[in-house]
Amino acid sequence: MGKQRVLSGVQPTGNLHLGNYLGAIRNWVEIQDQYDNFFCVVDLHAITVPHNPATLAADTYAIAALYLACGIDLKYSNIFVQSHVSAHSELAWFLNCITPLNWLQDMIQFKEKAVKQGENVGAGLLIYPVLMAADILLYQADKVPVGEDQKQHLELTRDIVNRFNHQFAKDKPVMKLPEPLIRKEGARVMSLTDGTRKMSKSDPSELSRINLLDPPDQIANKIKRCKTDPVKGLTFDDPERPECNNLLTLYMLLSGKKKEEVAAECQDMGWGQFKPLFTETAINALKPIQEKYQEITADKGYLESVLRDGREKAETVANQTLADVKAALGYSAPV
């Protein structure tokens, strides 16, 4: 029996930050030898909200380079660009046609983002979860690493699979039911300016996040200015001190220390002691990623070859799934 397959991806919108790394990519790296992995740069998702066409291609390559710099190993994993595999868009259309509108209108992320965009909200944002379902189902993924905020989208994917197989493939299901792969620690890294909100690329304040490619002086400045409280003695899990819990968690994850060690080390500290310690830890943790990124981006031909190989491998799997779906729907084969 072969390895189970994992599918995940990140949008090429803005810089990758500690939330992306600790909540997703580092987890991929740690488990990649256990699975057959398909890691995608989801650039089709990137245009569901206003984007900059002048930087989309460069941002896409930057994310792929960061995958490699963070430790994604091509011996175990396949890296490709979503828009380079046309089956994503085609399967998304077929799934859109069988997905009830009210399922999509109930998605929490759509409701939140639609409020921000008002009358300018696009249909792409509404059907975003169906495209995500297509991404997963094309590769017959067994496991999908998701944060708590994406669990609802994965549940929708499972509902779509069940609906499709029931209507069109009862005797021989053509798409697999994916399961979530959830990491509790680090799954939700919070903002440096508000410990109750998730660290996000879309936050207008650069001070809210530490980007993977931030130079040391920027990291130091962001930590120096991050939101804290006047209480001496730093503790985990106090609901009245969300920023304290977040900063201790970040320090724990970046230092590699156990929670008990950090709790004992920091229980009598003030912020004046902790912030320099956290700053040094963050800078040292990101230095090898930044050095590897510079090495990879210096050789564009290498990165292009990685994405070319990735596309070819992805197409082999995706096109077979797409052919099975089209046959189940009754489409004629190309002549």
Swiss-Prot record:
Cell location: Cytoplasm
Source organism of this protein record: Nostoc sp. (strain PCC 7120 / SAG 25.82 / UTEX 2576)
Protein name: Tryptophan--tRNA ligase
EC number: 6.1.1.2
CDD domains named among the record's database cross-references: TrpRS_core
Binding positions (L-tryptophan): 135
Keyword Chloroplast: no
Subunit structure, as described in the record: Homodimer.
Family: Belongs to the class-I aminoacyl-tRNA synthetase family.
Renumbered ranges of motif 'HIGH' region: 12-20
Gene Ontology MF terms: ATP binding; tryptophan-tRNA ligase activity
Keywords, sorted A to Z: Aminoacyl-tRNA synthetase, ATP-binding, Cytoplasm, Ligase, Nucleotide-binding, Protein biosynthesis
Higher taxonomy: Bacteria, Bacillati, Cyanobacteriota, Cyanophyceae, Nostocales
Pfam families: tRNA-synt_1b
Function: Catalyzes the attachment of tryptophan to tRNA(Trp).
Positions with a binding annotation for ATP: 11-13, 19-20, 147-149, 189, 198-202
Cysteine disulfide links: none
Motif position, 'KMSKS' region: 198-202
Gene Ontology cellular-component annotations: cytoplasm
Top-level taxonomic group: Bacteria
PROSITE patterns given in the database record: AA_TRNA_LIGASE_I
Protein's GO biological process: tryptophanyl-tRNA aminoacylation
Reaction(s) the record says it catalyses: tRNA(Trp) + L-tryptophan + ATP = L-tryptophyl-tRNA(Trp) + AMP + diphosphate + H(+)
